Amino acid sequence: MTSFTVIGHTACTDASFPLDDLPGKGGRMDLLCRAVASSLFLSHGIREDTTCDIMLLGQPHPGRIIRFDGSALRSLSPDERNIASSIKRALAIPAGKTFREAGPGLLTRKGTLADQLSEKHYAVLDESGVDIRKVATEELPDAFLLSDNRNFSDDEMELIRDIPKYSLGPAIVHADHAIVLILNEIDRRRSGWI
C-alpha cells in the first residue's frame, strides 16, 4: 500500500466552506483536491492500493486529517468539486483522535504531523533530496509527505529533519504532479520496466 500525506497549511476546517471558492475561502482546498485525485485515480478506475491523507491546518479548528482509502472508496469522481464535497462531509461529523468513517473509504480524525509520522515510515519530497531513481526499490518507503503551495514551517522542518528526502528531478513541481511522478515510478518498478 502506498500512502500520501499532504499538508494544507490554510485549508479550511469548517464544513461550510463554499464549493465555488476552493482557492479563496476554502484555504487552497483546490490543491488538496487535486492531490487526492492524483493519488487515487487511474484512467478507468481507482488505485485500490493507495491512500491519501490530507491535513487541514486552517481555521477554525486546525489539525483535522481526512483519509481517502482507495480500497474502500465508492462514488468519488476525480473533479475538485466532488472531492471537496467529500471533504465537507467528513468535516461535518465530530472527530476525535481515532479515525471515524464519514462514508465508504472516507475517514476523519483530529491529529498532528507528529501523529502521522509515528504511524508509517515516510519520505519527504524535496528538490535537494536524493534522486528517487537512484534509490533501490526495496528502500523506497510506503508513505510520502508533501506540502501544499507553502514550504514546510520551521516546526514541521524540525519534525521531518531525520526523514529521508527524495527528489523527482531538476524542476520543482506542484504536489499533485509530484504524486503522479512517484506513482509512475512505482508502477514502472512493479511492472518490471526498470
Swiss-Prot record:
Major place of residence: cytoplasm
NCBIfam families linked: PRK02135.1
Quaternary structure and partners: Homodimer.
First-level EC class: transferase
Molecular function GO labels: S-adenosylmethionine-dependent methyltransferase activity; tRNA methyltransferase activity
SUPFAM superfamilies reported in the protein's UniProt record: alpha/beta knot
PANTHER family xrefs: TRNA (PSEUDOURIDINE(54)-N(1))-METHYLTRANSFERASE
One cellular-component annotation, GO: cytoplasm
InterPro entries in the cross-refs: Alpha/beta_knot_MTases, TrmY, tRNA_m1G_MTases_N
Catalytic reactions of this protein: pseudouridine(54) in tRNA + S-adenosyl-L-methionine = N(1)-methylpseudouridine(54) in tRNA + S-adenosyl-L-homocysteine + H(+)
Family affiliation: Belongs to the methyltransferase superfamily. TrmY family.
Superkingdom assignment: Archaea
A Pfam entry, by short name: Methyltrn_RNA_2
Protein name: tRNA (pseudouridine(54)-N(1))-methyltransferase
Keywords for the protein's UniProt record, in alphabetical order: Cytoplasm, Methyltransferase, S-adenosyl-L-methionine, Transferase, tRNA processing
Compartments, record wording: Cytoplasm
Function noted in UniProt: Specifically catalyzes the N1-methylation of pseudouridine at position 54 (Psi54) in tRNAs.
Binding positions for S-adenosyl-L-methionine per the UniProt entry: L125
Gene3D superfamilies: 3.40.1280.10
GO biological process, one term: tRNA methylation
CDD domains: TrmY-like
EC numbers: 2.1.1.257
Transmembrane segments annotated in the record for this chain: none
